[in-house]
């Protein structure tokens, strides 16, 4: 083997072959088509060595086994036949591993995903570490694909059909103990003894196939299987609304393998993989994947980041508590919280305790790890412990004089290099920095709620913010596990600016008599995770509508909402889920009562609630305003690129990923079609639908947001 080989064979003195996986020059192992020849050469040596007792596949990387196949291979395929051939080649290689005459063990530490898990499934036994980094799964569905190297056939036979369907249809990743319970791995051991434990397992005679639990055996029978697949199809259709063809094909392929045998199953798998690879949904989902990967690598500016060893947070409320958790528990940085009273500090500490305790209860971390992470967070009602903080995040009320006061206090009580980052959602960063002694160290860092779940943050420099401040803030966001996009300091920034007209239109249609559930269902069918009215309930009606006057003052009438309707709802003390009173009915602890709309809402706003528009018309009226505003943001350089605009919308508001984001969707529709549709809607519903200048210019020049050089390939 050459020194650049990703697979290296070493035969130990006890006649166990260890195949180390180490893709040269890469942080993580991914499978590439060109590795097939290397693996086959090793398999040939193994078959020819009659003295071998067993084989162990193990990664030489510090924290991953195999993170999956290289997705770029799919983009190089010109048609479905080429993609199908790629899948068949993978299937053949896995079959050769499975056919080895001696026990073959996969020794897994770190991520074992996609093609990595398919390789592990082809081994005769699997053993993994109890490390928090160890996860096993088949996430191909998230790219609009299915496992193409035998995963749809081997997994159901190993863990049972219902468990396999759940894993493959959702892309769910199992931790070590979950994998052991499911029968996906045979043992869980400390990382220090992984290799030796795998070697000992390899020396044993090949054991009989694990017996499936009674429930799985019943579901594997003809009657149980028929019932299961009928229920799974129904549930999946409700969830995907028909927008993700991969899910239906996954069900078909697994059912084919169980009903007609694995040979037919492998054939169906390869064929489905090839066809799915060519779908616009898969192409869009892969584009989102590559774009998010690029954004995570983007340093934000050309300047090197400044020191980032500890962080301060002003305000221990919902946002402050969430920011403290991601900073300490995700980023590993010491955090000092300041609040005006001890209750605020205790709230923030309890926020982190509750999240960590849930992880302990689910056995994701141990109690000592919880205590270690919690020890990173401390608090005070004054600025003691703030003098050495490298960056301070402000998460207080949306009040400009208060935030300006916070800037002055931080400049007085912290180091000369300390960055002040405001979590404002609506106030201009330039105004917050107006009286600052060091305005170059003031920046916006806009988190979305709930902080621990929402992946996006907006980094907002104002005109005087230094390049180093931008780079340091972007670095912090990445340490917090966030995907940061740098946006301009204009009213609403990017995400809230494109979201506001979308929600405004939903409220206007409500005043026209459309029913709440009809509006929400139409946008869910379009592809959003929740409808606009439900979203307003989730974020808080008071919070969600607070930015509307700011946007209307900045951009004019197109951002106006039916003020009397919003006032009526707020005056009736309806804030949404958080106080159990909103557009929907809520039971105990703010839980929605089976998606039932509160009928009193119609009387409150003075309408009957009789839907007249089709779902397509409802979706078009909401989405077109969002797209038009996104194009304006592109024109005004609120966002730096179409890439950032797509990621911001997908990660920030749940824009349908299978459409690739607003800019890829507009490119797919074509600028001419966009302009024609907006002009038609403007004639029907008024000038707020008038196409922006950017779209008109692009239609005239036949341009696109994503240039021809920008494909769905990773760089």
Curated annotation (Swiss-Prot):
Q: Name one Pfam family in it.
A: 3HCDH
Question: PROSITE patterns recorded for this chain?
Answer: 3HCDH (PS00067)
> What SUPFAM superfamilies does the annotation carry?
6-phosphogluconate dehydrogenase C-terminal domain-like, ClpP/crotonase, NAD(P)-binding Rossmann-fold domains
Q: Report which reactions are catalysed by this protein.
A: a (3S)-3-hydroxyacyl-CoA = a (2E)-enoyl-CoA + H2O; a 4-saturated-(3S)-3-hydroxyacyl-CoA = a (3E)-enoyl-CoA + H2O; a (3S)-3-hydroxyacyl-CoA + NAD(+) = a 3-oxoacyl-CoA + NADH + H(+); (3S)-3-hydroxybutanoyl-CoA = (3R)-3-hydroxybutanoyl-CoA
Q: What keywords tag this UniProt record?
A: Cytoplasm, Fatty acid metabolism, Isomerase, Lipid degradation, Lipid metabolism, Lyase, Multifunctional enzyme, NAD, Oxidoreductase
Q: Name its cellular compartments.
A: Cytoplasm
Which residues are tagged with the site Important for catalytic activity?
118, 140
Annotated region Enoyl-CoA hydratase: where? Answer: 1-190
One example of the protein's molecular function in GO is: NAD+ binding
GO terms for biological process, alphabetical? fatty acid beta-oxidation
Q: Which pathway, metabolic or otherwise, does it act in?
A: Lipid metabolism; fatty acid beta-oxidation
- Disulfide connectivity for this sequence is none
The annotated region (3-hydroxyacyl-CoA dehydrogenase) lies at 306-715
What the protein does comes down to:
Catalyzes the formation of a hydroxyacyl-CoA by addition of water on enoyl-CoA. Also exhibits 3-hydroxyacyl-CoA epimerase and 3-hydroxyacyl-CoA dehydrogenase activities.
Q: How does it assemble?
A: Heterotetramer of two alpha chains (FadJ) and two beta chains (FadI).
Q: Which family does it belong to?
A: In the N-terminal section; belongs to the enoyl-CoA hydratase/isomerase family.
The protein depicted here goes by the name Fatty acid oxidation complex subunit alpha
Provide the species name: Salmonella gallinarum (strain 287/91 / NCTC 13346)
